[in-house]
C-alpha cells in the first residue's frame, strides 16, 4: 500500500497536466511510497491519448494511476474530488489541482509530518487562490468526514466548508509555508470554470445597479431557466475594517466576501413581444427590451457583453450561492452526502 496519494481531477485541462504532471512526479519520485492518481472526468481534449502515449512508463512503475469516467457532462468539483479520493490507495490523500506544482520534496515533507503527528490536516496559508484547494489528510479522516459536500454546485466554498468540518471534528490545521510549494501555472479565470454547468448553460447576464455595494444580477440560461438576486460586496463595505488574522475564519465569515442579500430566486423565463417574462413560483415579472437593456418601472438591467466580466460575475454569483447554502448547514458530518459520495463508474489504466 502507498503511503501518500496525490489526487488530480481533470476535465479538458490537458495543457496544464502536460506542464505539471511529469515534473511533479520527478520532484517527488518515491516509487514505493507515492502515487499520483489522475481522474479523467470525461475530458474531450486528448488527455486519454496523451497519458497513453507519454506517461505509460510511470503507470508501469506504479507511481501513476489513471482513471477515466465517461459519465459527467459538466465538471462538478466536490463529486470529482470525492471520486478520486476514494480511488486513492494511500494512507494520506492530498488534493492537487492540475495547474499546481507540488515542489521538490513536498511528498517527503508530508510523510514526515503525518508519521510524527496525529489527527491533523495540512493546507496552504489560504492567501493564494491558486493553491487554496490543496489539502492533505489521512484517508480514514476523509472517509469519516464524508468527503466534500456535493450540495455545492459551481465555483467556490466546497474546500472552505470541508476544512471547517475537519476542524469541528477535532482535527488540527497545519500550514505549509515553504515558498517552493506554492508555484502554479498562471492562466485566465475562464479556465477555472469553463467546464462547469452554469457557464456552459449561460445565455446572457444582465446587471441592475443599486448602489456602490449592491447590484441585482439576472442570469438567463439556455433551456429557459433563470436566476436573479442582489449581490452585495461586503469586501468594499468593510474595506477600512481590520482584517481577521485567521484566514479560515475570514473565509467562513461574510465580512470579506460577496454575499446574496435576501434570497436567490430561480424560475422559468419565456420570450414575449418586445421583452421577456420571468415566471416565479407565485408571481411573474415582465421586462421590456430596449437597446440591450431589460426594464420595468422599478429596474433597468444592462446586458453584459464583456466576456471577462461575465466570468467574474459567474464566479462571484456561484460562490455567493454556495456561501448561502453553507450558512444554512450545521457541521454534523452525518448530514453531509447522506446518500453517498463520489459515486460513479470508472475505468483503471485503460482497462475498458
Where are these regions (language model features)?
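Short, well-formed alpha-helical segments that are part of the catalytic scaffolds
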Residues: 13-28
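Short beta-strand/loop segment that forms part of the nucleotide-sugar
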Residues: 32-45, 67-70
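A conserved acidic beta->alpha catalytic loop
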Residues: 38-51, 97-101
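Acidic donor-binding/catalytic loop of UDP-sugar-dependent glycosyltransferases
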Residues: 46, 100-113
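Glycine-rich, basic loop-to-helix element that forms the pyrophosphate-binding segment
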Residues: 71-88
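Short aromatic/hydrophobic "clamp" motif used to bind/position activated sugar donors
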Residues: 93
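Conserved donor NDP-sugar-binding/catalytic core segment of glycosyltransferases
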Residues: 108-134
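C-terminal catalytic/acceptor-binding lobe
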Residues: 167-352
Amino acid at each position: 500500500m502507498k503511503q501518500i496519494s496525490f489526487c488530480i481531477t481533470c476535465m479538458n485541462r490537458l495543457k496544464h497536466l502536460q506542464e505539471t504532471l511529469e515534473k511533479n512526479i520527478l520532484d517527488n519520485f518515491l516509487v514505493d511510497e507515492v502515487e499520483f492518481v489522475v481522474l479523467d472526468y470525461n475530458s474531450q481534449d486528448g488527455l486519454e491519448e496523451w497519458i497513453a502515449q507519454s506517461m505509460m512508463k510511470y503507470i508501469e512503475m506504479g507511481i501513476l494511476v489513471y482513471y477515466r469516467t465517461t459519465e459527467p457532462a459538466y465538471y462538478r468539483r466536490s463529486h470529482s474530488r470525492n471520486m478520486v479520493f476514494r480511488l486513492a490507495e494511500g494512507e494520506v490523500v492530498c488534493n492537487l489541482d492540475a495547474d499546481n506544482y507540488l515542489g521538490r520534496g513536498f511528498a517527503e515533507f508530508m510523510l514526515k509530518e503525518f508519521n510524527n503527528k496525529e489527527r491533523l490536516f495540512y493546507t496552504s496559508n489560504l492567501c493564494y487562490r491558486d493553491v487554496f484547494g490543496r489539502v492533505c489528510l489521512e484517508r480514514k479522516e476523509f472517509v469519516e468526514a464524508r468527503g466534500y459536500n456535493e450540495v455545492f454546485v459551481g465555483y467556490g466554498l466546497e474546500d472552505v466548508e470541508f476544512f471547517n468540518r475537519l476542524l469541528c471534528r477535532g482535527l488540527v490545521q497545519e500550514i505549509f509555508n515553504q515558498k517552493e510549494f506554492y508555484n502554479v501555472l498562471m492562466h485566465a479565470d475562464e479556465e477555472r470554470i469553463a467546464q462547469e454547468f452554469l457557464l456552459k448553460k449561460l445565455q446572457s447576464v444582465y446587471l441592475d445597479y443599486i448602489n456602490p455595494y449592491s447590484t441585482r444580477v439576472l442570469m438567463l440560461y439556455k433551456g429557459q431557466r433563470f436566476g436573479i438576486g442582489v449581490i452585495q460586496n461586503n469586501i468594499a463595505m468593510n474595506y477600512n475594517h481590520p482584517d481577521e488574522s485567521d484566514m479560515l475564519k475570514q473565509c467562513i465569515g461574510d465580512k470579506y466576501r460577496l454575499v446574496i442579500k435576501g434570497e436567490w430566486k430561480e424560475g422559468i423565463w419565456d420570450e414575449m413581444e418586445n421583452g421577456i417574462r420571468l415566471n416565479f413560483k407565485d408571481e411573474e415579472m415582465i421586462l421590456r427590451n430596449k437597446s440591450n437593456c431589460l426594464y420595468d418601472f422599478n429596474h433597468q438591467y444592462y446586458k453584459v457583453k464583456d466576456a471577462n466580466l461575465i466570468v467574474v460575475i459567474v464566479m462571484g454569483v456561484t460562490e455567493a450561492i454556495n456561501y448561502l447554502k453553507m450558512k444554512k448547514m450545521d457541521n454534523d458530518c452525518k448530514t453531509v452526502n447522506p446518500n453517498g459520495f463520489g459515486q460513479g463508474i470508472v475505468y483503471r489504466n485503460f482497462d475498458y
